[in-house]
């Protein structure tokens, strides 16, 4: 079994054992990453169309209502890492971050007619980014989705 298959199997298990039971019980579920992350990272070594085929079950079974992508320039990520201190994780290296960001952009471009993708500018301070996220979500829900969101 190759890594692509393992990620797809893990996604199916996550849906069946964690996400669906929570949704069926009426809980609101927020996920970080979900299948978009797998696609973005794996496009470094795999064809996106192949990845979409291998993950078709997950996408048919449980699609998110909306995807919020906080887009931060890799150079800014490096500055934030330096400010926080400590060593960068493997995936936090600037060049790899550029490639992964490109992967996300490819995924979002390919899926823009199939998914509700909200790209939020991640520059600035935490309060600014949070305000942009809430604004994007509010705009999405006001556009016709019968849901209401409230800020904590």
Question: Where on the chain are the PLM-derived regions?
Answer:
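Phosphate-binding/switch loop-helix module in NTP-utilizing enzymes
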Residues: 7-29
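Short secondary-structure boundary/capping segments
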Residues: 20-21, 58-60, 109
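Short coil/turn segments at beta-strand junctions that form active-site/ligand-binding loops
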Residues: 25-27, 64, 116
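A glycine- and Lys/Arg-enriched "phosphate-lid" helix/loop adjacent to the NTP-binding pocket
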Residues: 38-103
């Amino acid at each position: 079994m190759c890594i692509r298959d393992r990620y797809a199997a893990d996604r199916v298990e996550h849906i069946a054992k964690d996400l669906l039971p929570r949704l069926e019980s009426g809980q609101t579920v927020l996920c970080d990453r979900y299948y978009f992350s797998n696609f973005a990272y794996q496009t470094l070594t795999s064809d996106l169309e192949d990845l979409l085929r291998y993950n078709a079950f997950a996408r048919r079974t449980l699609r998110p209502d909306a995807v919020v992508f906080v887009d931060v320039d890799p150079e800014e990520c490096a500055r934030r890492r330096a400010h926080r201190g400590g060593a960068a994780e493997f995936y936090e290296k600037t060049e790899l971050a550029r490639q992964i960001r490109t992967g996300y952009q490819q995924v979002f471009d390919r899926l823009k007619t199939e998914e509700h993708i909200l790209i939020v500018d991640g520059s600035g301070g935490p309060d600014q980014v949070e305000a942009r996220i809430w604004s994007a979500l509010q705009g999405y829900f006001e556009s016709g989705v019968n849901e209401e969101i409230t800020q904590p």
